[in-house]
């Protein structure tokens, strides 16, 4: 039981070390539009939910999903959404475009939804209602949609930035 309770601390620590590594290796880069970690985390969580459906009539169905959701997904979504907000804020400082505005708005929405998710999880531990599971599903789906939008728009922004940088290189060679 103690090792199960240490899982969120280990995962958050691992995520923070990954973020620190990313920050130290990408110091000079200004383009930070694409975030894959939120998308992968949401796909993994939806996969675990589908493997262990809490709506089945078995006695302990959904326990694995609820434990993963409470102990791994919720702490990681806060860390990754905060890091995404930081990266997109840094990106927006250098590249102001419609894509960058969309990414910034979406990153703020992701962070606020992760805080709402934490509050709903805390409230469900205080007093459990059957509607809390439906709210978890709704938040998971909305976070999944937002992270997918973040991935797609971020990729489009990266292609736009690469085109701008390539054009600047060609202009530099001509001079």
Q: What residues fall within each predicted segment?
A:
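Hydrophobic alpha-helical membrane segments
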Residues: 73-83, 101-125, 132, 139-149
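Alpha-helical transmembrane segments of integral membrane proteins, especially early/N-terminal helices
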Residues: 2-4, 25-43, 104-109
